């Protein structure tokens, strides 16, 4: 079992938390799966509103400009020809959705990989609560400084304990995003340098991942722990 320190918002250790090796061990990192998850996420963000005019949409008559033979000029059927200026575009882009189906098991596997990677790099922090007595942006900035957040950070809170004061206090922090435990995505964990979870949020995520993890892998991890013990 991986043991993680639980801090308060002042950066002081107030406890510890054990995380299953089957979910958070460094050997759980699957870079290929992370790449697939990020590719799918970024594809789903594309608007897909690009469009070029087809033959029926460009302006111009459909009348043949001159007879087929006898003029010495190249044959032409319409002023809207794609070979001519102001003509239509052949096989041009049309509005479409770039989203595609991505299996839930693969998404959860990518989430396990992202969490294991953050934990192995020492970039995952667990706090007892993200709430502050005076939930102002300035106080949250000072708290993040005490937690040694120098660049960007992802704050993850339990959906059942999220308060409006936390949302208002964190929304104006530069380089900081607040998400719920049931909407955190592998892309978010890779995008931000630090990941700060409330204890309730990381416990909920660990429980969800354990329910959906392979029973074979869990059994193998448990056997490995017994051998080490």
Role assignments for model-derived ranges:
Residues 1-47, 93-229:
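Extended polybasic, low-complexity segments that bind anionic RNA or targeting/receptor surfaces
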Residues 52-91:
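Glycine/serine-rich anion-binding loops at beta->alpha junctions
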């Amino acid at each position: 079992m991986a043991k993680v320190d639980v801090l308060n918002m002042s950066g002081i250790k107030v406890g510890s938390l054990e995380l299953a090796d089957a979910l958070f061990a460094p050997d759980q990192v699957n870079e290929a799966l992370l790449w697939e998850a990020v590719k799918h996420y970024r594809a789903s963000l594309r608007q897909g509103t690009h469009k070029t005019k087809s033959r029926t949409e460009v302006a111009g008559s459909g009348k043949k400009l001159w007879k087929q033979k006898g003029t010495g000029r190249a044959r032409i059927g319409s002023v809207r020809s794609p070979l001519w200026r102001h003509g239509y575009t052949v096989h041009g882009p049309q509005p479409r959705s770039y989203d595609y189906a991505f299996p839930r098991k693969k998404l959860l596997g990518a989430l396990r990989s992202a969490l294991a990677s953050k934990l192995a790099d020492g970039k995952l922090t667990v706090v007892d609560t993200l709430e502050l007595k005076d939930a102002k942006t300035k106080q949250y900035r000072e708290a993040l400084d005490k937690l040694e957040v120098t660049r960007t950070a992802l704050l993850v809170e339990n959906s059942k304990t999220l308060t409006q004061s936390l949302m208002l206090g964190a929304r104006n922090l530069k380089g900081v995003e607040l998400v719920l435990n049931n909407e955190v995505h592998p892309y978010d964990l890779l995008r931000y340098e630090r990941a700060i979870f409330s204890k309730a949020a990381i416990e909920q995520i660990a429980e969800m991942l354990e329910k959906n993890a392979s029973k074979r892998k869990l059994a193998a991890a448990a056997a490995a722990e017994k051998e080490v013990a």
